[in-house]
Amino acid sequence: MIRVYLIILMHLVIGLTQNNSTTPSPIITSSNSSVLVFEISSKMKMIEKKLEANTVHVLRLELDQSFILDLTKVAAEIVDSSKYSKEDGVILEVTVSNGRDSFLLKLPTVYPNLKLYTDGKLLNPLVEQDFGAHRKRHRIGDPHFHQNLIVTVQSRLNADIDYRLHVTHLDRAQYDFLKFKTGQTTKTLSNQKLTFVKPIGFFLNCSEQNISQFHVTLYSEDDICANLITVPANESIYDRSVISDKTHNRRVLSFTKRADIFFTETEISMFKSFRIFVFIAPDDSGCSTNTSRKSFNEKKKISFEFKKLENQSYAVPTALMMIFLTTPCLLFLPIVINIIKNSRKLAPSQSNLISFSPVPSEQRDMDLSHDEQQNTSSELENNGEIPAAENQIVEEITAENQETSVEEGNREIQVKIPLKQDSLSLHGQMLQYPVAIILPVLMHTAIEFHKWTTSTMANRDEMCFHNHACARPLGELRAWNNIITNIGYTLYGAIFIVLSICRRGRHEYSHVFGTYECTLLDVTIGVFMVLQSIASATYHICPSDVAFQFDTPCIQVICGLLMVRQWFVRHESPSPAYTNILLVGVVSLNFLISAFSKTSYVRFIIAVIHVIVVGSICLAKERSLGSEKLKTRFFIMAFSMGNFAAIVMYLTLSAFHLNQIATYCFIINCIMYLMYYGCMKVLHSERITSKAKLCGALSLLAWAVAGFFFFQDDTDWTRSAAASRALNKPCLLLGFFGSHDLWHIFGALAGLFTFIFVSFVDDDLINTRKTSINIF
């Protein structure tokens, strides 16, 4: 092969002194093969020839300075393709070069639903420097100095092949379109007609036009599948370097109805000028399964919008977002102050003692009426003393682990009762929770995932499902707005942690009154809220079905912890074991889904696990309720039917992606259990405090707003990249916040109000004896 090309080069050097001719000049390379060279004219649009067996055709077109910045498209076609329908592999190979760029055509081209015996590509055009002084100084001003377009045609078959070459020159005028007038920031091209064999290209010189940022939008009403390719002016349109340390900016976007691409200030300063191309695909299967295409070369209409942008600062929208997020914190500041004041009032002179005066023993077995309980709570809040009617409970506790001293002189008895410490006071229990292990693992995963998505081997435009119409980049991050808006989870998670710690005082007498304490569990929920912000930010580095696994486990754990909390708050203090079991289950389930995502039976495995878990929960609930079964039978039936419906849906409907099943099931069950808990409080005539009602109402309102933005569907990684790009929508607020950003903001706010509602919902029982609290 090297010998053949050396002979071709020698023949071309000799041919420079000869006149143009269409008569082939054969060079015999062996007894069985030859190379035929043809001189072609720029006026020839179509060239039809017969490639004989063991022959190589070389076609040469002389390019002078009139071809500067003109695109050249070369297409090849096998004339009678029916002869080769049974042939496998490449039949005809065509190489094209103009000295600056080159490409290779291999026919036939095989698509999923189509085999084409024609194909064509574009060459990067020649520029002024290709005819300038830096090449050869003595050529300056030489009108005969030129470049060459070389096309070689060969075949591996031992047969004659009739072929056609189509050589089209796209005039430089269409590049000049992207020159903006003074003060002009937007240019529009409407309803441009493109076909598979008729693409369109543009040239953008950012340095000449003082462009710092640039945005291109394409939209079409036709049913199409196309590729948008942008490449620096000095790089090939089709080739992509696999050298890991080579900087490049070749971007390929498949699209249907809409495509957006944004050139950042960093990209423009690095590459200066770009070429933008749009190619219509002959087959729609790469973008969508639905198509109305009748032939591979149908005309399609596409409109273009080019916007010249100024440098945008993210400071103003970020500052306004922080002001909005911190405003609810001011609402809870008086609550925190009041809690701290009350906790100081409740504290006795000796923090680990409770003193009280005895009453006759015949009163010890009497139950408190409702009014007596109210008086008891008032008395307790005022002076920290346990009233006489509670001596029975105190006596029982004293029998286990107490010290009693009696002063016989005045018959006043002092009973020393060490107060039971809550779980947060037992610092050793903190180490039993898995939070300390999860955080560094999650951070390491985020860093490694970012490195992978920014490598030269990754096509982020096809792998990452951003809303390109409202993606605001920062450095290597394509959608900084989607990342920074997760700060609400961090802020509100920290607030809930502080609030939970401040409310520890309400469990000072938890061994006697109120529901069981779960301070450490509340703190864990707040910590996972903070972890959710990190996980969601990691996901938005490159949103996809793979990255979705970073985001969802934290959501699943939070939903699970809320159910565990409300399940045990009336039975016992939740231990770290429940959190660890829940976390192991969530991680194992997500690992199972990831490991077997390509298998057809994984949904049935999930369904079996789902049935076992639901059945176990229903049986455990019935056993723990005893006489309360009749009141909760409706809930158990609704709970079972709801989960059964979910199982049927994700087994039969492919619309639910495999990675979404577990998350949606956790969320639905959490909502159902919280609704059940609230309904049971109402059925048992328990009072819900005004603070809990306020937080509950605000959480419902915030969830409604967040849900509205969540279901706007500006991306969808369950579809193809092109189909997802068709859903992209412009920013809704301040040119920075899209619908998903607003979902982050209001979702974090709704989560905070939900957590506080759950924490406050049983405050009416804080002075009620544990033996009198309803179990459900």
From Swiss-Prot:
Q: What happens when the gene is disrupted?
A: Absence of silencing in adjacent cells or tissues. Decrease in transgene silencing when combined with eri-1.
State any GO CC term: lysosome
Q: What is its main location?
A: membrane
Q: Which residues lie on this side of the membrane: Cytoplasmic?
A: 341-429, 503-510, 565-575, 621-633, 681-691, 763-776
Task: State if S-adenosyl-L-methionine is listed as a keyword.
Answer: no
User: Which Pfam families did the record assign?
Assistant: SID-1_RNA_chan (PF13965)
Q: What is this protein called?
A: Systemic RNA interference defective protein 1
Could you read off the lineage of the organism from its UniProt record? Eukaryota, Metazoa, Ecdysozoa, Nematoda, Chromadorea
